[in-house]
Amino acid sequence: MANHQIKAQRRKDEGKGASRRLRHAGMIPAIIYGGEQRPVSIQLNHEQIWLAQQNEWFYSSILDLNVDGAGAEKVLLRDLQRHPYRQLVMHVDFQRVSSDAKLSVAVPLHFINQATSPAGKVGGVVITHELNEVQVSCLPKDLPEFIEVDLSTLNVGHVIHLSDITFPIGVELSTRLDKEHDMAVVIAKHAVIEDDAPAEEGEGDSK
């Protein structure tokens, strides 16, 4: 598992006015909560977070949050608020992580070998990804940045369900599966060709 470090500083002033001043200075108001410690208000460099939030790992990995150079604290991103139309992160929430407590995290799916699968080699076939992430439960040390879904044997007319995915050791779905709740992940089927529009009434009738 790769280490991803985020630098931060403690935030002294709070409130809307203080948060507005932080944003004008190129910083983001944020908070750390969870565990046995009290919540801590912090501030983050906007440029660093803006670049980080463009990567999958920022949302599904354990992050090393270093506040005032005091050493890394293991956290997980729990909320990120963006401005509705500007390239601006408004606020970030981090949750402390305990090494012996299981987490419930949405992990992205990476689909491999689609183009070389039997369905991928047939013209006129549409392969749809019904899910792009799954909610898993695991200890922090077992948390994967992504889960691969191998489509090498996918045929036309086949459906890959959640129960068909191989999860890493120590990782399991957050919800139990049964026949009624085994969601489709990938579907391969022939493209539907719509018929030409019906002729207008009377068109082609002999007079």
UniProtKB/Swiss-Prot annotation:
Checking SUPFAM superfamilies in the record gives: Ribosomal protein L25-like (SSF50715)
Q: What is this protein called?
A: Large ribosomal subunit protein bL25
Q: What does this protein do?
A: This is one of the proteins that binds to the 5S RNA in the ribosome where it forms part of the central protuberance.
Highest lineage ranks of the organism? Bacteria, Pseudomonadati, Pseudomonadota, Gammaproteobacteria, Lysobacterales
Gene3D superfamilies, A to Z: Ribosomal protein L25, beta domain (2.170.120.20), Ribosomal Protein L25, Chain P (2.40.240.10)
The organism of origin for this protein:
Xylella fastidiosa (strain Temecula1 / ATCC 700964)
Q: Which GO terms describe its molecular function?
A: 5S rRNA binding; structural constituent of ribosome
What start-end ranges are recorded for coiled-coil regions in this protein?
none
Name the gene that codes for it. rplY
- GO biological process terms on file: translation
